[in-house]
């Protein structure tokens, strides 16, 4: 994590001790809850979400706000824990906040959406990819990222085309996000007529995967797909290298964090990951990227610009609706397209993006990435 992001994370964590932190000076405001992990093992993804959302709030407010009102970001810490996410959602409702950017992890997002839908709160997640989140007929739940059933086939087809002659293992962390996307990858690979030699779950939070790695070595595994987050992937990479497992590793966007290099070191070189397109490299976003850099913030984090887009969509939806009424804003979101740093976004009836592309990248030990052609 870069120094600016580390300072930001410490600030968020200190303020979140009281349950939330608020960012606005105006009396006439529209509050937006920024719900995600301030603490916990994947707090880095919460840092990305907040950096993007707060930048959008700042820039919208400087441009005279929304319908004469200023936006106010209110931070809530769910630690990517489902039970804590429910508590956060109830607090958002009790605080009278009607719009949410978050949550971050699929496993914490889904239970929170039940409360938001029942209580008339509009939520847009910039990062939760589990299809189940938007498959229950809810009208107030949206996202500015693609789904596992979009991302999984991209990885599966890549594996089937380029590693069909290798012995393949598909692992996951037994969580909604990780197991869901691993299952999609396995299905795509097997549909191509290729056998998956090992399909197995590990426990998120465990530190020693040597027994599993020994099993992979015994099976002659040469390619490993892991559905989960960077803490476990980093340890798998490091311990596999130490054990002499000669295999290529691949994962979803949940492993695409600079912290994986801090955990795995040189073993992170060559890891493959499906990630959103590098929106920070789009020339049309140069002024925005410069604004992040002026704050010593890293705009390349995978959820930074999707979070910026989530706030942008809420603001433009309020303008289209003519008022900050969640149901009217939801109708406006489905009826229009919105220009954002992550493209012209349009939503289907479920609240999913009509179009979103995942791309395969190769990770490097200096925490940079290059697109695989």
Name these PLM-found stretches.
Residues 2-7, 11-15, 26-373:
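Extracytosolic ligand-binding ectodomains
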Residues 20-26:
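Sec/Tat signal peptide C-region and signal peptidase I cleavage site
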